[in-house]
Amino acid sequence: MLMPKKVKYRKQMKGRMSGTPQRGVSLAFGEFGLQATECGWLDSRQIEAARIAMNRYIKRGGKIWIRIFPDKPLTAKPAETRMGKGKGSPDSWVCVIKPGRILYEMEGVTEEIAREAFRLAAHKLPIPTKFTSRKDAHEG
């Protein structure tokens, strides 16, 4: 699972997901990409599940880049615990996603294979996504 090696503060506030991302909205490495169309939180397990789904489909054909990293800790209290007594301990890590953020990139495969691999990956994610390519970016 993806998680930071070391953080300054163990626990964070929930925060807000409004607005657009400051960076990470254009393709930087590959030819094709999977772009988020709405905001949400992606868990480290969901990021890994989508990566495995893509790798299984393209086999050894191309290269995949993960453009996101879960750096926000989620806390949880133990089961059957009464309310109060402070905030729970860090449980998992999430990545805050805003609309337009590139989640994954891919190259070394045809567009049809990339589309299908990203479709399989999108089924593992809790947010709606769309396929994007360098060709689309230059035309629009």
Swiss-Prot record:
Which PANTHER family does this chain map to?
50S/60S RIBOSOMAL PROTEIN L16, LARGE RIBOSOMAL SUBUNIT PROTEIN UL16M
Q: Pfam families this protein is in?
A: Ribosomal_L16 (PF00252)
GO cellular component assignments = cytosolic large ribosomal subunit
| UniProt-recorded Gene Ontology molecular function terms | rRNA binding; structural constituent of ribosome; tRNA binding
- Write out the entry's keywords from A to Z: Ribonucleoprotein, Ribosomal protein, RNA-binding, rRNA-binding, tRNA-binding
Protein origin, superkingdom: Bacteria
Q: What task does this protein carry out?
A: Binds 23S rRNA and is also seen to make contacts with the A and possibly P site tRNAs.
Q: Which gene encodes it?
A: rplP
Q: List the disulfide bonds.
A: none
Q: How does it assemble?
A: Part of the 50S ribosomal subunit.
Q: Which GO terms describe its biological process?
A: translation
PROSITE patterns associated with the record: RIBOSOMAL_L16_1, RIBOSOMAL_L16_2
Provide the protein name.
Large ribosomal subunit protein uL16
State the organism of origin: Geotalea uraniireducens (strain Rf4) (Geobacter uraniireducens)
InterPro entries per record: Ribosomal_uL16, Ribosomal_uL16_bact-type, Ribosomal_uL16_CS, Ribosomal_uL16_dom, Ribosomal_uL16_sf
Family recorded in the similarity comment: Belongs to the universal ribosomal protein uL16 family.
